[in-house]
Amino acid sequence: MDKTQNSKSVNDMTVGSPLRAIIQFAIPLILGYILQQMYLIIDAAIVGRWIGVGALAAVGASSSIMFLIMGFCNGSCAGFAIPIAQAFGARDYAKMRTYVSNSIRIAVVFAVVITFLSCIFCGKILHLVNTPKEVFDDAYIFLMLQFAAIPFTIAYNLLSGQIRALGNSKQPFYFLITASVINIILDAILILGMGLGVEGAGIATWLSQGISVLLCIWFIQKKMQILIPKGEEKKFDNKKVSILLNNGVPMGLQFSITAIGLIMLQSANNALGTVYVAAFTASMRIKYLFTCVFENIGVAMATYCGQNLGARKLERIGQGVRAAIKMMVVYFVITFLLIYPFADEMMMLFVDKGEAEVVTYAAQFMRIANYFYPCLGLLTILRYSIQGLGYSNLSMLSGVMEMIARCGVSLWLVPALAWTGVCFGDPVAWVMADLFLIPAFLWLYKHLKKEVL
């Protein structure tokens, strides 16, 4: 038995109340994500109000591209953490560390290849999504700076994913606090003080991500040595690499496939003009702030299901899913009471009151999306639960459903309804994904229960 297994830095989610375990794990994730989105909101407010709506549009014009590439990186790293969580739940710590060492090898290769290809094709991608000419140069500069930070993004998501696989979501939250505060300070210095514009926003993000990586490394070395491979555990293991890729690549592709639909939707929206691009950017910032609770309840479910599958506690997995759905319903009611009456005021964070069109369109987007938040909540809970159970291919197929839905909206609804069609892009995608995920999860859960019995 590993002497470090009882460290206060780890959290066993296979015992105790499922609801309590999920809430305790999810709260730091939610707070961290809110903090991250608050930074993005402050960043967009600085760009939109002090540089101009055109600069805000430049940052927003590349958002779906960033989701395509960063989504693959983040999803892959999250997938690499699943076998680690399962091995931890099974108390097989040597196996867990072998997964850690081999996931690092894969991540290094991914970082080099993805960074190189992204930088090479940056300009062509912006043309592909119909980026408005008046904001193209700024969008190109901002995107290149984001691509330069890909190695840091992969490193942070890999290391924080390993920490969370052992049930510790607090430390990554503390690291995000530090990085976000530094990011905001750098924004103020580089954009307001030095007048660097969108370049300043990109540089600030680059530096803060590097700091978050260093903090993860420090914590693992000092407080979570159970993750550090020893001796034979450091060797390349073809079987372990195959398992890691089978979990990581489908999860990465799920995000990227979803992003293809978002790119199609954003491309259709970009063609409507700069006002609509700015409205889309502002509304997405607020949307992500509200939907992060759904997303991070889902992330908690991936670790929860992974650990409990390793411990062969299938009944406990079902209890956890039901508890998460109850949390989702309560949160939806809260969002409705905030968004429906105050959407317009929220949008004024990004643009002056004189930009009435931007405010009106962005508020419309928020209200329509809010009606369908229960669909999004169910989507994240079931998708991440399936991932935690080790069936990433099924969750990837739900991403395909989202992509098909958004492409359909882009090709037919947007030409017919213009901005209103854009507003229905997300809701239609969420409903389509749920139509696949609900029967998929029920089948998988029944199948696994038979295997355990």
Report each predicted region and the residues it spans.
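Transmembrane helical elements of multi-pass membrane transporters/channels
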Residues: 24-43, 145, 156, 179, ...
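Interfacial/gating helices of multi-pass transporter permease domains
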Residues: 47-67, 133-138, 198-199, 240-247, ...
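Small-residue-rich hydrophobic transmembrane alpha-helices
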Residues: 56-116, 153-172, 279-343, 376-398
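Short runs within selected transmembrane alpha-helices of multi-pass transporters and secretion channels
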Residues: 77, 145-164, 172-180, 201-214, ...
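Hydrophobic transmembrane alpha-helices of multi-pass small-molecule transporters
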Residues: 68-71, 183-188, 213-217, 289-292, ...
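Residue-level signal for short hydrophobic patches within transmembrane helices
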Residues: 15, 19-38, 42, 65-72, ...
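Helix-terminus/linker motif at the lipid-water interface of multi-pass membrane proteins
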Residues: 38-56, 126-133, 189-196, 256-289, ...
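Short alpha-helical transmembrane segments in multi-pass integral membrane proteins
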Residues: 1-26, 84-149, 193-249, 305-372, ...
